[in-house]
C-alpha cells in the first residue's frame, strides 16, 4: 500500500479487478478514468513543485499540430514529484495496470520518460488528434498504455482542454474527459486509438493545463493492434471532419493514407 493513494484506492488490485471489464469494453477504445485516486495533500505538494515549463529548457512544441511544453526526463522534477513518478513506475502500479488492462505481455516502465513527464499547455495551446508513436526509441519496446494524471484546480468546463478519444475512422468523438485535479486517465495505445486536445485552450491568462504523463511498454504486441503495418512509426495526425483549423500540410498526407487503408479494411 502506498502513501500516495487515496483511501478508496489503497487496494489497487481490487480496483483493477472491479473495473477491468469496464476498461475493456469502453468506447471508442479501451480506456477509463478515476477521480481522487491519490492523496490530496501529496498531490497538492506535487502541484506546488510544477514549474512554468515555458521558462525552462524544455521541449517546446509550436506548429500546426501542437502548441505545448514538455519536460525532458526527470530534470525538472521536484523531490516529491520524483518520488511520485517513481511510484507510478513501480511493480505494484505495473501489476495494477496489468490486471486492469488485461494485457498478456509483461508491462515494462520507462525510466527515461521518453515523451512523458510534465506536460503544460498555455492559453491558446492545443494537441491535435493523433495516434502515438508505437516504439520506444531507446528500448525498442512496443508502446501499450498511457497514464495521465491531471493537476488542474478550479478548472471550469468553459476553459476546454478536454481529453478527446475518437473513433478509428475519425467519424466522431467517442468520449471526452475534463482534465480535473486528481483525475487519472488510462488508455490503451494502439494504431486505432486516436486522441488529443484539439481545440485551443480557453483558460484565463496565468492559468495552464498541467498533467503528468507516463507510458508503459511490452516486448511484442497482438497483431490486431496494427492498423496498417508492423513498421515503427512516429506520431501520426488525423483530421476531424468539418474542422477547418485541422490543417497539417505534409503531416496530414501521412495519416490520410492510414485512414484510407483502415476504411478499405472495414476497421
Residue ranges with predicted function:
Residues 1-16, 20:
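N- or domain-start disorder-to-order transition segments that initiate the globular core
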Residues 48-51, 76, 85-143, 152-154:
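Non-heme Fe(II) oxygenase catalytic core, chiefly the N-lobe of the double-stranded beta-helix
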Residues 67-71, 100-108, 119, 123-126, ...:
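A structural signal for the main folded, soluble domain(s) of proteins
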